[in-house]
Amino acid sequence: QGADVLLVTPSADFFAEPHVDCLIGYAKVFHQAGIKWTVSSYASEAANFAMFIGSQEQMREVAQRIWQAARDLGVKRIILGECGHAWRVAYSFWDTLVGPFDFLDPAYPMPMHICEYTDDLINREKLRLNKAANDEMTLTFHDSCNVARATSMGGRPGGQFEIPRAVIKAVCNNFHDMADDTIHEATFCCGGGGGLLTDDLTELRVKGAKPR
């Protein structure tokens, strides 16, 4: 208790490589912005796996844990870590599944994606960034199909495409989009959704990635 932000992120960010780098990055952003934040051991999974199997009741149970954790901790806002399934469920279903979230500060959007939050800090010049530190890398961005086709960001059409790219461009000098017919709404499945992430389906996942 006592934190302003509850960060809810995919569980892989706590134990898997390279996902843990995401959690480290979130912590750096919060620290530099001077934000009091916390995570919950009760609601420690942002990815709502019930969407894999189409169970609305289980989706509700998982989302309810996040609602309850935010209320018990007395935070002002909830911020979601990067995860296509997590963001789709939060953006499209939270309010009707377990809302209202009227105990949160109405001054902040709910839910809020970590990219939205970081982009806002960058635009307000609250983060010190050194783009040249990443000059050895050439970066691109894969649009999550769940985010691209079923959500938005920033309260505007196309925000789910513009905001993540704006964050990347703010921290590097060498960003290049992939072919137009493979990005935005035309994105390919990354092989992480719908249960395809399981080891048993590795061969199928690789076949799906080959058109890239």
Task: Report each predicted region and the residues it spans.
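Iron-sulfur cluster-binding electron-transfer modules in prokaryotic oxidoreductases
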Residues: 1-212
